[in-house]
Amino acid sequence: FGATGGGVWKTENGGETYENISDGFFGGSVGAIAIAKDDPNVIYVGGGEVTIRGNVSSGYGVFKSVDAGKTWSFSGLPNSRHIPRIVIDPTNNDIVYAAVLGNLYKPTQDRGVYKSIDGGVTWKKVLYVNNLSGAFEIVLDPNNSRVLYASTWRVQRTPYSLSSGGDGSDLWKSIDNGESWTKISTNSGFPTGTIGVIGVTVSPLNSERVWAIVENQEKGGVYRSDDGGENWIYTNSSRSLRQRAWYYSKIYADTQDIDGVYVMNVA
């Protein structure tokens, strides 16, 4: 599956051709797609672009399919505007988390991490920071779905400018299925000063190995923790990994090499 400003697209031949499967059900602005691990018929889509350029377009909540994208139904969070990430608990398809960035142009309380335990019928806000800081990233520990990491991002947009960073831009950890959260971006080794957007990933080979890519003027770049976020090591400051942070800032742990990690950007 893929998503762009033109909705959700599906391929059944390894990417050679794609077919739009969202026209007629919801708008073209899409920020997140999640597919249930043990049932690929179950799909969630979050509206609103993640790459918040000046011409960014917003979405209108979560949509769900139970027939691999043939049909869709509205699944809540109508005021979310921008949903950068949706994750489904691999042990229970009815448990779903949504990172809601919210309205980019004005303060709103419709931000944060939301959780559903009934397959998207109802949602509960489980992490809220302030009315200018929404949730950007959520990841589950691949070895223990009770453990989650989430980043929140203070960001405001106008048609001609973007303000990234400040109070509310933080990294968080939960060890109880998202019911409570502890801030880990103030732990030893994490950068200080004004922090912007944060990407995070957990190694499937060792749950204690956590990587983060952090927007920070003085010490932005890649950070590694070997103890589940208790302490951090600054591993790479290359600007080529962190330029245009608001556009990229995604990081992924290698599934075969515990020291392998991937960051998307432009050279």
Please tell me what each predicted stretch does:
Residues F1-A267:
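Beta-propeller blade termini and top-face loops
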